[in-house]
């Protein structure tokens, strides 16, 4: 979201103006996570910590002229992948807004408690497939080369539960 407000709107406006065939996915995590969680025009807090008027990404996208807009919750992998496939089948300028709060921001700044830690421990080929497909930083590879095991490091698990949608 912060990058969209910083430098993405002009590219989107040009895509609409030039009638490009493009699918843009905007990752709306509610903060400027890459540089320390500073506010941006899409959040309700100013740099001084005061409430402010925030810009709604969907309204901005539609205001630029995009009519084909969808919102997804990316931790719902099936729904997100379905929406992506549907949007890929269309033409013109399309935008998907993926809305989930930054886990670090939610836990540190908003003081949200982490949900339950996922309990995943797969063995063999399924373990390697799970590790390769998701590459979660909380996954730990153990076992042997012949019998690999993947488990979850509780201290690193954000509680998103995406692994439960990917692993058997």
PLM segments and residue spans:
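Phosphate/pyrophosphate-recognition segments in soluble nucleotide-handling domains
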Residues: 110-116
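Thiamine diphosphate
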Residues: 2-97, 103-110
């Amino acid at each position: 979201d912060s990058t969209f407000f910083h430098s993405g709107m002009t590219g989107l406006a040009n895509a609409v103006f030039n009638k490009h065939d493009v699918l843009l996915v905007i990752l709306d995590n509610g903060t400027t996570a890459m540089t320390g969680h500073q506010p941006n025009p899409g959040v309700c807090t100013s740099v001084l910590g005061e409430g402010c008027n925030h810009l709604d990404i969907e309204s901005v996208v539609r205001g630029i002229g995009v009519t084909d807009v969808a919102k997804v919750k990316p931790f719902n992998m099936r729904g997100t992948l379905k929406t992506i496939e549907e949007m890929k089948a269309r033409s013109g300028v399309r935008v998907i807004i993926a809305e989930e709060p930054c886990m670090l921001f939610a836990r540190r700044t908003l003081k949200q408690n982490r949900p339950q830690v996922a309990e995943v421990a797969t063995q063999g080929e399924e373990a390697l497939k799970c590790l390769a497909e998701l590459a979660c930083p909380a996954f730990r590879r153990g076992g042997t080369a012949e019998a690999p095991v993947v488990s979850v490091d509780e201290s690193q698990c954000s509680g998103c539960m995406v692994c439960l949608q990917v692993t058997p």
